Structure formats: C-alpha cells, structure tokens
C-alpha cells in the first residue's frame, strides 16, 4: 500500500504517553509538515506554539478539561497549540488550521510518535487557552496536539464506505 495511505489508515489519536522526551529534530519535522499544509490562496494563517513547560501544561490541562478528550496534555513531553489569525483569512482560516493539524498528526505518526488531537475551537476552553497563552482575540485556537511516545495502541474502526459515499 502507498505510504501516505498507510499512514492515514494506521494513525490513531493517542491519549497516553510514555515519559520519554522527544528530539527537537522530530518536533521541527512535525512543525514543517504543518507549514506545508494547504491554505486558501496560500495565506498560511497559522501559528504553532510548542509547549514543553510542565507548569504551563498543567494549567493547559485544567483549562482544557471542558473538552471531553483532554487526556495526554500532562503526560506528553510536548503539546503543539495550533492557532490561526482570522484577520489574515476570516473565511477559511479554520480549514487551513485543521489541515495543518492533520499534516502534523500524520507527520508525527510517520516519525514513530503518538499524537493526540484535542479540538478546542468554539469552546470555553478556547477562551481559557487564549488567556493562558496570552493570545490576542483575533487568534483562534483550533486544536492542541499532545506529542510523544505512545503508551497505548488503540484499535481503529470505520463505517463501511458504502454508508457515506455517492457517485452521481
């Protein structure tokens, strides 16, 4: 099977991490994958914040508790906060940020790391994260991506393709 399709099909959201650190080289490779995500008119409205400080991660975990799947923030050696500046692209920034987050999740997986995905957009947690990280109101927080060495291997499942695809 094609490497990209294999990565897409085998990637899982990870919520449990080993305490081992990860290299700066791998973090930079993940960020580089986000940088190459598609964006409307190539506006690239994103900003990526890498959080390693345990104190900040603890606060981030408290703020993110509103989201159902906030697990992994404290345990992961790094958390990437994916943001977009809606002044740059008010209509498509969210899609661009989600594309960048997906690229980073796939890149982390391809590098042998586990990556979580905590959706924060439009929640009270988003406002708390903006405040904690001192982000301007024009910056939207799309997702938090805890990154590290996975301490779990969740099984994946999907609906049959016939349930949601139409050809006309």
Which residue ranges define each predicted feature?
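Acidic, surface-exposed loops and disordered segments
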Residues: 1-168
